[in-house]
Regions:
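Predominantly flavin-linked oxidoreductase catalytic cores and closely associated redox partners
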Residues: 1-15, 19
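Active-site lid/adjacent beta-loop-alpha segment flanking the redox-cofactor pocket in flavoenzymes
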Residues: 6, 21-112
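A generic alpha-helix surface/boundary motif
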Residues: 11, 69-70, 129
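C-terminal catalytic lobe of FAD-dependent flavoproteins
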Residues: 34, 76-173
Length: 173
């Protein structure tokens, strides 16, 4: 807002959890869409898992008990064996959530300003491809062919992108 630009994004906390090390149990990442739960295992054996965002805007990097309980319940529904593991720690990270679940990758409304925000849950997973497209956008001062749909003005024009419930209110889609 300091630049006079209102972005259609909200900041929400996404919690993650890790257990004590355990023998190899999970290869890859397992997700449970109905319960908003995901789980994987680190190289050191810790079971890493998480779920839904806290349901309000915040910049705090800590989660709240209702989401903690919901994530644990989803995990135990999918993998009851997790109940025997000791939880070592949990943490929260701030997610910049666009209203349709898709990022904003665009030339900004101010000369020399470029936007790459609103990635919701998975921005780091898309970094190689989006980085290539964003570099093109900066170098040419126009969107790459692959990110032309991800403009800031799509919200004002009503051209939101249906990401199948990946925005800040996934249960509302």
């Amino acid at each position: 807002e300091k630049l006079g630009i209102r972005l259609p994004i909200e900041s929400h906390v996404l919690q993650a959890f890790v257990t004590e090390p355990y023998k190899p149990l999970i290869k890859g990442v397992v997700t449970f869409g109905a319960g908003h739960f995901y789980v994987s295992q680190s190289d050191k054996g810790g079971v890493v898992f998480g779920g839904d965002i806290d349901g309000y805007n915040t910049y705090a990097q800590r989660g709240n008990l209702p989401v903690f309980e919901d994530v644990i319940a989803g995990g135990l529904t999918m993998m009851p064996c997790l109940s025997r593991l000791k939880l070592l720690r949990n943490w929260g990270g701030v997610m910049d959530m666009s209203m349709d679940g898709s990022p904003i990758i665009d030339v900004g409304p101010i000369d020399g300003l470029y936007l790459n925000t609103g990635w919701c849950y998975g921005g780091f997973k898309a970094t190689p491809a989006s980085g290539y497209c964003f570099a093109h956008t900066i170098a040419n001062d126009e969107a790459h062919e692959l990110n032309k749909a991800y403009t800031l003005d799509r919200f004002a024009k009503g051209y939101t992108i249906d990401e199948k419930g990946m925005g800040p209110y996934p249960k509302a889609h």
